[in-house]
Amino acid sequence: MSEEVMAIFKAAGAILEGHFLLTSGLHSPVYWEKFRVLQHPHYTERLCGFIADHYRRSEVQVVAGPTTGGIIIAFEVARQLGVRSIFAEKEGGKRVFRRGFTLESGERVLVVDDVLTTGSSISEVMEAVARLGGIVIGVAVLVNRAEQDKQFGVPLFNCLRTVTPTYTPSDCPLCAAGIPLTRPGSEAER
């Protein structure tokens, strides 16, 4: 599976090299531009199929993801599992379910996201699920690029595991070398 996932990301031109500011605030020489993959329904269907197949017997009732890439992944995994999908948005420094999204007490939720680096988005969605009384039964991501294994207290499934270095801005060798910093998805790139 990992070879197929890597081939999909390469075919879509989604593995970028340079000096990038990640959403987490960390810097990295590699950026996984998941939207270059997610713009292709056949790639999205295939990748989300790996996740759906992995959790098919887990009695998932709802698939939840964070905005923005997580919305697409949650929808497609939920479609393949035949369940609902919802997403959590940032509000007041935390993620919340708005737009009329609810969970029943004890409802079994699979949390999905596109790329795992620090795990903060996933943790925030898990907290939002808990606040509504849902039970997170697993976590899944397309790409796990975290330097260290992340523990969420539930099983973690990734379509691709790859270690990509990240640096705090103060310790970034790319900054020290004077390589310009790119902010993917920022207004400056549009």
Q: For the regions a protein language model found, what residue spans apply to each?
A:
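Active-site-facing substrate-recognition patch
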Residues: 1-57, 187-190
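Short glycine-rich phosphate-binding loop at a beta-alpha junction
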Residues: 58-67
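A generic structural signal for well-ordered alpha-helical segments
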Residues: 55, 77-78, 129, 149
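PRPP-dependent phosphoribosyltransferase catalytic core
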Residues: 2-8, 126-190
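Hydrophobic/aromatic beta-strand patches that form the interior of the parallel beta-sheet core
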Residues: 64, 86, 110, 137-140, ...
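Residue-level preference for short coil/turn positions at secondary-structure junctions
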Residues: 59, 104-106, 152, 168
